[in-house]
């Protein structure tokens, strides 16, 4: 495997720690990578398209951005087990609403403007269930960490707390976040309920330039697949990155973000032009 430059967005301070550990892991397995850090996903995809990096650890929206900009020529690598088969939950106060249609004319909270799981996919989900964006409900956005595509969870959590406090009637959050907030007491399971769930979708994935050879991508993936959660050193990396196993990437899981982008009039192109 040739030396690969791999982009990563610093959505939290631990990102640099994670990639220091991953870089050492590759060295121990006879390969060399160089982590290149970015402050947001637009700059990361810019670098990928310009050939300044070979790969990017991308959000669903950033993967779609790369796919559209490369006219479908981008390649993909592995993802985390926790990236597969995610859902977003529509959450309300317990007993307040019975159906999605009951939210017509109400105020719905969303995460940051560019969050796939807490805004874009939810808006398309509401559209598919008869509620049109900009017409059938008032949207209240919690723009925390714009440019990070919702990875920081901030706006998503703020929207949830606004729902709990009665500032909005409903909110959306990733299934894993909902479970974590119920578990740690951030939200009271006796006060809230899941009104509806989206279909499954996939989250982050490694995106490669069209010029990166299939052999190098396979070598990159094969080394990542060697991480073993039962090994204490590997477990440290995997716990920080939120997984128990690296698995092959796949394209089918990005249909919902693609549909959301189209519903909002090529959101990512307009969004990038304003950054």
Task: Identify the meaning behind each predicted range.
Residues 1-8, 13-18, 201, 208, ...:
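An extracytoplasmic/periplasmic, membrane-proximal ligand-sensing/linker region
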Residues 3-29, 38, 61, 85-159, ...:
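Bilobed "Venus flytrap"/periplasmic-binding protein-like clamshell domains
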Residues 48-49, 103, 163-164:
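Hydrophobic residues within well-ordered alpha-helices
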Residues 42-66:
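N-terminal low-complexity or amphipathic/hydrophobic leaders
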Residues 65-97:
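Glycine/small-residue-rich loop that forms an oxyanion/phosphate-binding "nest" at active or ligand-binding sites
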Residues 57-71, 127-128, 157-189:
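A ligand-binding cleft/hinge motif common to bilobed small-molecule-binding domains
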Residues 73-83, 136-142, 180-200:
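Short beta-strand->loop
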């Amino acid at each position: 495997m040739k030396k690969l430059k791999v982009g990563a967005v610093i959505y939290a301070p631990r990102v640099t720690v994670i990639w220091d550990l991953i870089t050492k892991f590759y060295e121990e397995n006879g390969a060399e990578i160089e982590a290149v850090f970015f402050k947001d996903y637009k700059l990361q995809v810019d670098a990928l398209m310009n050939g300044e990096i070979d790969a990017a650890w991308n959000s669903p929206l950033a993967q779609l951005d790369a796919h559209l900009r490369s006219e479908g020529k981008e390649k993909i690598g592995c993802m985390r087990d926790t990236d597969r088969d995610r859902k977003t939950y529509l959450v309300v106060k317990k007993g307040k609403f019975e159906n999605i249609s009951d939210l017509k004319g109400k105020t719905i909270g969303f995460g940051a403007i560019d969050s796939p799981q807490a805004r874009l996919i939810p808006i398309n989900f509401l559209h598919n269930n008869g509620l049109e964006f900009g017409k059938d409900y008032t949207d209240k956005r919690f723009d925390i960490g714009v440019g990070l595509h919702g990875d920081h969870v901030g706006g998503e959590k703020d929207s949830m707390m606004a729902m709990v406090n009665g500032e909005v009637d409903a909110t959306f959050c990733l299934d894993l976040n909902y479970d974590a907030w119920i578990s740690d007491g951030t939200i009271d399971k006796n006060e809230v309920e899941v009104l509806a769930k989206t279909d499954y979708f996939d989250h982050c994935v490694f995106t490669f330039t069209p010029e990166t050879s299939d052999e190098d991508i396979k070598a990159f993936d094969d080394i990542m697949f060697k991480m073993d959660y039962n090994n204490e050193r590997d477990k440290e990396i995997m716990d920080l990155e939120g997984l128990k196993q690296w698995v092959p990437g796949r394209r089918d899981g990005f249909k919902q973000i693609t549909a959301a982008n189209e519903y909002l009039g090529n959101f990512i192109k307009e969004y990038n032009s304003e950054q």
